[in-house]
């Protein structure tokens, strides 16, 4: 179970999580949601369906279908005529999904490792996950689910059995990392490098650094930042939220460095 209760301590969709208006049978408010998806084909019994307006398809058109498939509740940006189940009326289903993800993450007793950088995010995620899986139950970002749609879906996939979540976060513009890290609230934040990606929005590498380090504002109180010492831009970051950053790199002066290199 994802344990997003429609009312109570875990998740109150109506009041505490997405600030919408509940419309439907009041006796269903204690229903427990067992999953949350944006793809109507993935809806199962007890799921929350979040319809997203895309360039070609509006997910709202599938609301009747998902109720037939057993959806417990849906979100909607407009009032529904004779729906087969309850729904929460919200201004933006995308924004509501982010609020739900942020609320759910904060309700979990789990450590979160956030990973970002211009390149190397996915391989770093896989390496960190592989090491942690030797001792812990790990939930990690699947594929490229690292943006403002994919990250909340990844967070919804966390279960009580998981001890660590390794979350990849990708951005292309200012403000995106702010929104992503608001949802993920990392305990450890890894930045692989500051490159030349998305300069059409970020201007130059200093802009990339500024955008990537927006994540520092939303780290957990005792969180640590792990930065690449071999990156000239990241090397300028001395402290993060009053604490020294942990540096890794090729040189022995780094806090963590390689002593042996092998290739297959």
Task: Write out the residue ranges for each language-model feature.
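N-terminal leader/targeting and accessory segments in enzymes
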Residues: 9-10, 14-99
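Positively charged, low-complexity/disordered segments
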Residues: 1-8
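Phosphate-binding loop of NTP-binding sites
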Residues: 96-229, 233-243
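Short, polar loop motifs at secondary-structure junctions
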Residues: 73-81, 229-233, 250-251
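Conserved beta-strand scaffold positions in the cores of enzyme catalytic domains, especially
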Residues: 87-89, 112, 138-140, 245-247, ...
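Thr-Gly-centered strand-to-loop micro-motif
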Residues: 38-39, 51-53, 140-142, 167, ...
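Adenine nucleotide phosphate-binding catalytic loops in nucleotide-utilizing enzymes
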Residues: 16, 205-206, 213, 239-264
């Amino acid at each position: 179970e994802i344990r997003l209760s429609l009312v109570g301590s875990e998740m109150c969709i109506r009041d505490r999580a997405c600030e919408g208006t509940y419309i439907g049978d009041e006796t269903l408010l204690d229903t427990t949601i067992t999953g949350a998806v944006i793809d109507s084909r993935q809806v199962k019994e007890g799921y929350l369906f979040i319809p997203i307006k895309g360039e070609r398809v509006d997910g709202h058109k599938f609301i009747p279908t998902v109720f037939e498939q057993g959806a417990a509740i849906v979100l909607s940006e407009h009032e529904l005529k004779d729906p087969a189940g309850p729904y929460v009326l919200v201004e933006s289903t995308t924004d509501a999904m982010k609020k739900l993800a942020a609320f759910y993450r904060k309700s979990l007793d789990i450590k979160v490792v956030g990973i970002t950088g211009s390149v190397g995010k996915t391989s770093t995620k896989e390496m960190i996950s592989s090491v942690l899986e030797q001792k812990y139950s790990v939930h990690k970002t699947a594929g490229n689910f690292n943006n403002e749609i994919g990250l909340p879906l990844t967070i919804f996939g966390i279960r009580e059995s998981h001890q660590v979540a390794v979350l990849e976060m990708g951005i292309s513009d200012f403000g995106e990392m702010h929104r992503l890290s608001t949802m993920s609230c990392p305990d450890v934040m890894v930045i692989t490098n500051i490159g030349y990606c998305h300069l059409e929005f970020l201007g130059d590498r200093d802009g990339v650094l500024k955008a990537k380090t927006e994540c520092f504002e939303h780290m957990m109180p005792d969180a640590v930042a792990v930065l690449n010492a071999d990156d000239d831009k990241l090397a300028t970051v001395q402290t993060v939220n009053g604490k020294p950053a942990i540096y890794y790199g090729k040189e022995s002066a780094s806090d963590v460095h390689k002593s042996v290199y092998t290739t297959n």
